[in-house]
């Protein structure tokens, strides 16, 4: 597969890479769980030690936002970026109240594909795209951010991305960047359940 897919729609990987480059690979990366977690591990670069906070394989959706708040207090000298999917963000959405109260300067990047992406990928690959309980009904995240007095920007196209990231980084305090990415993007390669490395799948 392509290292960095570049179809008509934004991909999760290119958003992650763009944020990494804009922060000169020096930010602390916090991940939630799902495709966003794997894309972050794949496309975010580091120039310093102790630069990633993740729950690994525990599957704790909703981990990212509160962990990022903690990281801003633990390392106030560094930029903290958290990547989340729309499913994970809605599991701990109330933490925006903590960010507002504490003025925690978390840079939140929402990779919104309107799906529980990781589960959808499995349903696509192993269940003939019979999507069950994976499509997401999302609220207007710009209105939610406004309600919490958090600056926010929604990006729909590749041309808008760099400017929005620069705005996020330049903002003194928290910021929510919603990137509307391709709905059926996949994280490849992957090993099928019970399979070995030599059975690795390269495409969906």
What do these predicted regions represent?
Residues 1-66:
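Active-site diphosphate/adenylate-binding microenvironment
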Residues 39-204:
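Thiamine diphosphate
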